[in-house]
Amino acid sequence: TPAEVRLKKGDNELRVVFESQAMGDGQFRLQWSGAGFGFEPIAPERLSFAADDAELAQAHRLQQGQHLFAERRCARCHDYALSPRIGESAYGELDQSAPDLRTMGARVHVPWLAAWLREPHTIRPDATMPEFELTDAECDDVAAWLGSLGAPPPAPTFVAEDAAKGRVLFRQLGCVACHQFGEAMAAEPALAARIAIAHVPQKWHASALVAYLRDPRAHHRDVRMPDLRVSATEAHQLAAFLLGGTSAVLPPSRGDAERGRRIAQQQRCGICHDLDLPLDDRPFRRLQNLNPERGCLAEKPHDHDAPNHHLSDEQRASLRAFLAHATTAPFRRAPLDYAQRHLQAQRCTACHGFDGVPSTWARWVAVAGAKEPLPKDQDPVAQGVPALTWVGAKLQPSWLLRFVAGEQASPRPWLTARMPAFARHGGPIVTGL
């Protein structure tokens, strides 16, 4: 029911009683007006809340649990009754894919594959790939088999100026907002949380890296890397820069490919990844019968013959809390909730400020610019990269949907900063905003 209150000088406590609907988003408007201005939304920096509220903490715990449940692809293993419905989940969230491995040998070096299989979270702390209880020899075997799936095309030829131009592009396009590369600047938490990519020379065949930069989704529909729509020349220059970095030489990996194929089948890698392997139909434990203290959620999962997702205590608590809702909540379409979770997962705030918090890119510029003056085309603040605060109230949803999906030309083509395409997750995020 609409109601009005008169604000007094200083802080005001507002109490709103709201009963949400059974399905979809519940919503209401909180506006204000005063001398000289009509009704408008209250700016978020004018509002505060009790961060220690118990109900709010529980809601955040369930929200994180739902995101982890989808991100770690729990439904692919743990509920055959749910599996046929995975594609029916809201926004296809339970149907998130893992990389297609059927041509892995054409893209990635075998020694890196072996290192990744041993300890994925050492290479990338936020990896969604779990660690399996495999010996070093077994990791070498699986890497040898994956490496046999395809051969890399001839490597491109790089010249010195390619890497120099790639370094400029790396800054102009905002790659520094998500990635650490060739720098030792990690004092601020937001900058330290960026993805380190010093291992790129260890991982990629050169031709495959160029192709990946041009089309990140070619072998992974749900890859978190956005499509910056770089040209062939730009991809070539960026690859030259990234492959020119220094990284430790990995020891050679000499495994048995046939043994590796059998191990991959035994570990049921094909449940998450596209692989030309028959699937083992041994059932996993149903969601309703899971012991939340055992298996993947145990403190030591390998003691229970389960993969180790390297979950923190907080993440385990969130997943345990969410399990009771796992067969129903993912099928409710709630775009606001989806947007809140995926603004972080898709790293939207790496380039855009939000609710008064500057973007990671702007923070990087503040630190890097103090050491080395940066030209305007490498500064998101100078270029006017917009904040996301109230973007849903300012822009037409139909236009914004096309823009985020990469189907709408930029209204400011003279800027070097470039909005990437988020064809898979962009629609629900825009709807939520």
Language model features by range: what are they?
Residues 8-13, 18-24, 99, 134, ...:
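Repeat-solenoid scaffold signature
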Residues 54-91, 96, 179, 184-187, ...:
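Conserved, compact domain cores that house catalytic/ligand-binding motifs in diverse enzymes
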Residues 46-70, 148-171, 241-265, 315-344, ...:
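Electrostatic cytochrome c docking/interface patches
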Residues 1-59, 63:
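Acidic/polar, compositionally biased interaction segments
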Residues 18-20, 34, 81, 150, ...:
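Surface-exposed loop/turn motifs at beta-strand-loop junctions within extracellular Ig-like
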Residues 85-151, 186-247, 279-331, 359-433:
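Extracytoplasmic electron-transfer domains, predominantly the class I c-type cytochrome c fold
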Residues 70-76, 81, 128, 138, ...:
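Short pre-active-site segment immediately N-terminal to redox-active cysteine/selenocysteine motifs
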Residues 7-9, 21-23, 70, 202, ...:
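Surface-exposed coil/turn segments at beta-strand junctions on protein surfaces, enriched
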